[in-house]
C-alpha cells in the first residue's frame, strides 16, 4: 500500500511489472499471475465486422489530444480505481511524454478511447471507455498499429476480459511476463 503517487514512483512500478489501483482512497500495487497481454504480431485479431467499421471511417482517431478527458471518461463508472489523484499524476506523465491517449471522435465529440503508459518498448494499457458502438475497439486497433510502427514489443492489459480476448489477448504466467518486460525495457520505441 502507498499513500501517495508520483510520476517517478509510477515509472519505477511499471519497470518492475507492477501497477497501482486506488481502492477507497488507498493505493495498492498489483502484480497479477497470470498476466494478460495483447499480441503485437499476426495473432492480433480484428473481426470482419470491425474491419468494415474501420473502413467506413466512422470515427476520427486522434492521439494525445484529450488525455485528461480520456482518463476522466474512463473513471466515470459505478466502480472505478481511477481517482482524481490518479488523473493528476498520470497527466503529469502525459506532459512528460510517457502516458498517452487514443481517442475516437465523431462529429466533433469524443465518443471513446483509451489511455496507457509507454516506457521503452512497453505499453501498459490502463483503461478504455466508449459511448458509441465500437469506438473503443477502433481506438484499440489504432493503438496496436501505432505500437507496431513505433517498435513496441509488449502490450500489457493486466487482466483478461472477454472483450480483449476477441482481439487475441491471452494470459501468461507472471515469470514469462517479467521476461518479456525485461526485453521490452531494453528496446527503444517511439509512440
UniProtKB/Swiss-Prot annotation:
Keywords: Acyltransferase, Cytoplasm, Transferase. It catalyses: N-terminal L-lysyl-[protein] + L-leucyl-tRNA(Leu) = N-terminal L-leucyl-L-lysyl-[protein] + tRNA(Leu) + H(+); N-terminal L-arginyl-[protein] + L-leucyl-tRNA(Leu) = N-terminal L-leucyl-L-arginyl-[protein] + tRNA(Leu) + H(+); L-phenylalanyl-tRNA(Phe) + an N-terminal L-alpha-aminoacyl-[protein] = an N-terminal L-phenylalanyl-L-alpha-aminoacyl-[protein] + tRNA(Phe). GO terms for cellular component: cytoplasm. Its EC number is 2.3.2.6. It is found in: Cytoplasm. Functions in the N-end rule pathway of protein degradation where it conjugates Leu, Phe and, less efficiently, Met from aminoacyl-tRNAs to the N-termini of proteins containing an N-terminal arginine or lysine. Belongs to the L/F-transferase family. One of its GO terms (molecular function) is leucyl-tRNA--protein transferase activity. This is Leucyl/phenylalanyl-tRNA--protein transferase. The gene is aat. NCBIfam families: aat. GO terms for biological process: protein catabolic process. Its main location: cytoplasm.
Amino acid at each position: 500500500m502507498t499513500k501517495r503517487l508520483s510520476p517517478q514512483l509510477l515509472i519505477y512500478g511499471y519497470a518492475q511489472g507492477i501497477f497501482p489501483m486506488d481502492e477507497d482512497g488507498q493505493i495498492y500495487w498489483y502484480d497479477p499471475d497470470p498476466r494478460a497481454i495483447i499480441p503485437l504480431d499476426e495473432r492480433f485479431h480484428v473481426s470482419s465486422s470491425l474491419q468494415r467499421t474501420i473502413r467506413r471511417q466512422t470515427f476520427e482517431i486522434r492521439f494525445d489530444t484529450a488525455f485528461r478527458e480520456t482518463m476522466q471518461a474512463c473513471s466515470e463508472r459505478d466502480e472505478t480505481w481511477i481517482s482524481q489523484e490518479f488523473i493528476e499524476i498520470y497527466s503529469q506523465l502525459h506532459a512528460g511524454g510517457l502516458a498517452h491517449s487514443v481517442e475516437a471522435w465523431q462529429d466533433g465529440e469524443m465518443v471513446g478511447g483509451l489511455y496507457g503508459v509507454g516506457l521503452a518498448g512497453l505499453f501498459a494499457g490502463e483503461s478504455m471507455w466508449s459511448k458509441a458502438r465500437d469506438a473503443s475497439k477502433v481506438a484499440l486497433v489504432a493503438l496496436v498499429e501505432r505500437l507496431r510502427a513505433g517498435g513496441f514489443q509488449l502490450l500489457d492489459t493486466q487482466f483478461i476480459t472477454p472483450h480483449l480476448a476477441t482481439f487475441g489477448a491471452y494470459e501468461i504466467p507472471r515469470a514469462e511476463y517479467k521476461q518479456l518486460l525485461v526485453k521490452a525495457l531494453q528496446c527503444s520505441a517511439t509512440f
